[in-house]
Each structure stands twice: as structure tokens, then as C-alpha cells.
Design a protein with these regions (language model features):
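Conserved ATP-binding/catalytic motifs of P-loop helicase motor domains
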Residues: 11-13
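Residues flanking N-terminal targeting/processing segments that define the start of mature chains
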Residues: 15-23
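Peripheral/terminal regions associated with large enzymatic or DNA-binding modules
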Residues: 19, 28-45, 49-117, 121-264
Length: 264
């Protein structure tokens, strides 16, 4: 009889509605806190992913055109700028064909801009960030990262007149150099299919850009300088020697980049 009473008492205690309510409230407290904590963690993670996505949307991929005589220099440049690809030619391809090869390879990358540097390019400090900031506000889909002295001679006086501008870009109908070029990735396949043959690569890209009504925008100052060394190309189409002094008019960085332009 005593055992029966104790059993009923235990059942009665287990079925006590007040105790059951207390147990339910106790069980639910930590669950509410866990859900709040989980939501915060998820939001932070989502923001991080959005930040990564933002960095990925305004990106560029860099390739380098190099000659075997400058292989060591080219490898240093590749490491400095974080280039994704480099083509080193011993002269069998030639300058123009090697440029085309690098542009063609870069089209495999899913980025907004494709950038080709020559092996004698000298990048500014903090080059990748400066390049991102400049390309984000570029006034043209065809950008030259270098504007040099000495060559071409017929443009030097015009550049000198524009050199005092406060604009962040100098614009011109012609691509004057091939030391550092950035082109919006969407245009590169069409460019490669329509480059005229038999021209130096800067003149070939100029001809294509003019036909497509693209102005060339030069970063001002130049984000790339030119190592004024003995040229790898012995004979030029114009048969004119390359004299010393082929360096950027201005080479440096900006705290911020805008779309302000000044025609050359």
C-alpha cells in the first residue's frame, strides 16, 4: 500500500502543471538566446561575403608581355603586381603576336578589366589598389596607364600644354604607348578579332578603338613608369632611333580618383 501511494505521488508530481510550465519556460530561455546569437553570426558572415563580393565585382586581371633577355626583370614585375599570366618570347613570336597571346589568355578570366604590362613597366606604389580606384571611374573602356616623354614627338607639345591640369585623366583619340594598357573585358574578344595586321600593337589598338569610337583615357599621373633601357626591338616601322628620356610625364598616385578629364 505504501509503494502504491509513493508511485501515485511521483506521477502526481510529474504531472503538476505548475512544474511543467516552469520546465517549459526554463527550456525555452536558452533557445531564444541561441537563436539571437545565431542571427547575429549569420548577419556578420553575410556582410563579410558581401564585402568579398564587392571586391570581386570591381576586379582586374594582369598579364605581362616579356622578352627572354628581361626574364628576371619580368618575374619581379609579375610578383610585384600579382599578375595572373606572363608570356616570355625569345623573338620567335615577335612583340605584336606576344601581346595578342597575352590578351587572348586573359579573356579566360571572369573579371571586369584586363590589363597588359610590358616587362619594362615600373608600377607606382600600392599599384593594385590605385588601379582599382582609377578603373572604377574610368571615363573610357580603353585606358593607358602610361603617358611618356620623347615619343611620339608630334604629341609632346600638346601633352606639355595639358600637363598643368587638375584633371585626373588626359584623353586622346590615339593610344601612344603599349607599356601599360587596361581594356574592359567585354571588348577584348572583339578587339582581338579586329586588330589590323602589320602594325605595332599600340597603333593596331588605336585603329580598332577609333573604329569603335572609343577615346583613350590616360591616368594622370601615370600609374606606370617606363624603365628607360635599350629597346628589345632593333628596327622600328618608323626607322627612328629611341633616344633616352622615355619616361612618364608624371608618375604617382592619388588619394581619390574622379572622372575629371582634359583632352590632349
Amino acid at each position: 500500500m505504501g509503494r502504491l501511494q509513493r508511485t501515485r505521488t511521483r506521477r502526481h508530481r510529474r504531472e503538476n502543471p505548475i512544474q511543467r510550465l516552469g520546465q517549459m519556460l526554463h527550456r525555452h530561455r536558452p533557445r531564444i538566446r541561441l537563436r539571437q546569437h545565431h542571427t547575429t553570426t549569420h548577419t556578420t558572415h553575410h556582410c563579410r561575403r558581401e564585402n568579398h563580393t564587392h571586391k570581386a565585382t570591381m576586379t582586374h586581371t594582369i598579364g605581362i608581355v616579356a622578352h627572354t633577355k628581361r626574364a628576371e626583370q619580368a618575374h619581379r614585375l609579375m610578383e610585384t603586381v600579382g599578375a595572373a599570366y606572363m608570356s616570355i618570347d625569345n623573338g620567335a613570336l615577335g612583340c605584336e603576336a606576344n601581346h595578342r597571346k597575352v590578351w587572348q589568355h586573359l579573356t579566360r578570366h571572369n573579371t571586369d578589366w584586363l590589363v597588359v604590362l610590358e616587362d619594362d613597366a615600373i608600377p607606382c606604389d600600392n599599384f593594385r589598389d590605385q588601379l582599382d580606384a582609377a578603373l572604377a571611374v574610368a571615363p573610357s573602356p580603353v585606358v593607358s596607364l602610361y603617358l611618356g616623354r620623347e615619343r611620339p614627338r608630334e604629341y609632346q607639345q600638346r601633352i606639355a600644354k595639358a600637363a598643368d591640369t587638375t584633371a585626373h585623366w588626359l584623353t586622346c583619340r590615339r593610344l601612344l604607348h603599349a607599356v601599360g594598357i587596361a581594356i574592359h573585358a567585354d571588348l577584348v574578344p572583339h578587339m582581338l578579332n579586329n586588330l589590323p595586321n602589320g602594325k605595332p600593337i599600340d597603333e593596331a589598338i588605336s585603329a580598332w578603338a577609333r573604329h569603335q569610337s572609343h577615346t583613350i583615357a590616360y591616368t594622370w599621373p601615370s600609374l606606370i613608369d617606363h624603365a628607360d633601357e635599350t629597346p628589345m626591338i632593333a628596327t622600328r616601322n618608323d626607322n627612328q632611333p629611341r633616344t633616352p628620356g622615355r619616361v612618364a610625364w608624371q608618375h604617382g598616385t592619388r588619394d581619390t580618383w574622379t572622372t575629371d578629364t582634359q583632352p590632349i
